[in-house]
Amino acid sequence: MNYILFGGSGFIGTHLIHLLLKECVRPGDVIYDLDLVMPGEEGVVPGIVEKNDGVQYIRLDVRKPIDFEFVPTPEDVIFDLAAVHRTPGHPEEAYFETNIRGAENVTAFAEKYGIRKILFTSSIAPYGASEDLKTEETLPTPNTPYGISKLVAEKIHQIWQARDPARELTIVRPGIVYGKGEHGNMTRLYKIGRAHV
């Protein structure tokens, strides 16, 4: 079985790799981490992202057609974690180019190799700015380029799934993601709170 992680060197991906190695991988299974950055390079989570035995690290840009050498199996699963996600902080076209083009290329790769399972990490951003309680039935009304790009990427994945009833798609819309090695808003808020105690 192949566990194929696009964007596997990011915060979620590195924790997922640790979990897969600990709980899921059997002899003969392979984890592929396909990302623009590799463990030990600038831009990855220090202290969390290190090279792991049993993981094949491949430098890859999801904005371009995807192809790499591997032996597909019927059980393979893709984790599509690749994204430009900090908002604000990037030109608008960066969100669309990476998040939308990336979704097109990942689903084309899955189609080419007959991979029937994708887990796509979206965001709470497609819901838009609102203080209302969010549910799976809440109408998405994104109001940022990031939110729009993630909603379109969800639709690209849903179209891929709709083409074959044997395909399985899970879309996750996390709110705030935090934990060991994360240096975003929750960590900054926590540090400010501790400084004033």
Predicted features, each with a name:
Residues 6, 34, 78-82, 118-124, ...:
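SDR active-site strand-loop-helix element
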Residues 104-145, 165, 170:
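Conserved Rossmann-fold NAD(P)-dependent oxidoreductase catalytic core, especially the SDR/UDP-sugar
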Residues 149:
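Active-site helix of classical SDR
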Residues 161-171, 175-196:
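NAD(P)-dependent short-chain dehydrogenase/reductase
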